[in-house]
UniProtKB/Swiss-Prot annotation:
Keyword Glycoprotein (UniProt): yes
Segments forming domain Ig-like C1-type: 209-297
Organism of derivation: Gorilla gorilla gorilla (Western lowland gorilla)
Ranges per topology, Extracellular: 25-308
Biological processes per GO annotation: antigen processing and presentation of endogenous peptide antigen via MHC class I via ER pathway, TAP-independent; antigen processing and presentation of endogenous peptide antigen via MHC class Ib; immune response; positive regulation of T cell mediated cytotoxicity
UniProt protein name: Class I histocompatibility antigen, Gogo-A*0101 alpha chain
Record's subunit section: Heterodimer of an alpha chain and a beta chain (beta-2-microglobulin).
Amino acid sequence: MAVMAPRTLVLLLSGALALTQTWAGSHSMRYFSTSVSRPGRGEPRFIAVGYVDDTQFVRFDSDAASQRMEPRAPWIEQEGPEYWDRNTRNVKAHSQTDRVDLGTLRGYYNQSEDGSHTIQRMYGCDVGSDGRFLRGYQQDAYDGKDYIALNEDLRSWTAADMAAEITKRKWEAAHFAEQLRAYLEGTCVEWLRRHLENGKETLQRTDAPKTHMTHHAVSDHEAILRCWALSFYPAEITLTWQRDGEDQTQDTELVETRPAGDGTFQKWAAVVVPSGQEQRYTCHVQHEGLPEPLTLRWEPSSQPTIPIVGIIAGLVLFGAVIAGAVVAAVRWRRKSSDRKGGSYSQAASSDSAQGSDVSLTACKV
C-alpha cells in the first residue's frame, strides 16, 4: 500500500479494528481487500489478504511479480495447484470489479478523475467451538468511510448514504445477498474448518504472555507505571489497572494489541501515579494461556529495563504489515474452556472444498 498516505493507513487500521472482533470460543476466516486508483499510473493497485483468526495465511498483490495468490502460513502450502489457481482467478476477478466500481463511485460522488480513491472490503464467517456456523458478514467502504454492509440476517443491506442507496437497490435486484449468504454459510465454513484442522498446531495453540512492569519518573511528584505483556497468542488479552482494588479504567493509557513479528502479540497499559504511592497500584492480566489471572505490583528492587528495541521492532513490523496487507491489527476473542483440545473435521469433498475459499460472488456497485 505504498501509494497510500499515512492518514489513509490510519483509517484502514481503525476500520479493521472495528471489524475484527469475534465471540468467545469462536474462530473466524476473513478476507480483506483494498483497491487504490492511481490516475496516470496505470491500473488500480489491488491487495487482498486472508486471515484465519490471528494468522494471515494468503496474500495477493496486483503489483507483485508473481501475479498469484501466495501462501503466508506453512499449513496452507499443502493445498494443491487447483486451490491456488482458482483463488488467483477469483481475486483477479474481484480486482476487475473494483476497477469498474472505482469509476462508478467517482461518478456517484461527482468527483474528478485526478484524485486517488480507495475501495475496501471485508467479508468472512465465524464458527463456534463445535465448528458450526455463527455468523457471516460483508462490509464495504469508499475513501475510508462506511459505504454498504450486509446485515446480520444475511438477507438485507444497510447503506451509509444516498450513493450507497443506489448500490443497495442494484444488489437487491440482483439477489446478491442470497448468493453471498450461500457462500458464507457453506463454502466459507467448510474451508474454515479445513484450515483449523490443517493448521491446528498454530491456530489452536496458546502462548502465555511474558509480563513485567516498568517505572519512569516524569517529575518529582509523579511517575508512570507501565504493565507489559509480550510474546502471547492468541491476540485477545485484558490488561487492567487497580488502585487499592478499584479499577482505574478512566486513567489508564492502553495501546491496541500489536503483532510482534514472530507470530505472537504484545500490549501494554500505563497509569500515572503519585510518587511514593506505587505500591497501591496493581496490574491484572487475563489471557487464555494463563491458568489464572496474573497480578503484578511494582517492586523497586527489580528495576527492569524497558525493552525499547523489541517494542520498536514490533511497531516497525506492525506498520509494514498495515502498509503491505491493509489490515494487521486484530482483536479476536477466544476463551480456553471452549478452545483447548478442539478438533475440526476436514471439509467435505465437494467442488468448493477442493477449489477455492475466496468468494466467487462479486456484484458491481
